[in-house]
């Protein structure tokens, strides 16, 4: 009986976590009045550059580059700074 409950909970949570990225809302990264593109002159890949832009305020966010524009997800975790 306990094993059945644990199994049901495991399947429910793993399914929820697996589908989480699909339901996540993505927001375009904006600077001024424009939408920021992923291309850069720093020699970084588009995904790395987009990640750097989305996380510049010290908060963990998912990021993605879609159609050469940068999109940021909602805040995940605060960064922990080790001294």
Swiss-Prot record:
Lineage: Eukaryota, Metazoa, Ecdysozoa, Arthropoda, Chelicerata
Record GO terms (molecular function): potassium channel regulator activity; toxin activity
Subcellular location: Secreted
Keywords tagged on the record: Disulfide bond, Ion channel impairing toxin, Neurotoxin, Potassium channel impairing toxin, Secreted, Signal, Toxin, Voltage-gated potassium channel impairing toxin
Domain of life: Eukaryota
Protein name: Putative potassium channel toxin Ts20
The keyword Aminoacyl-tRNA synthetase appears for this protein: no
GO CC annotation: extracellular region
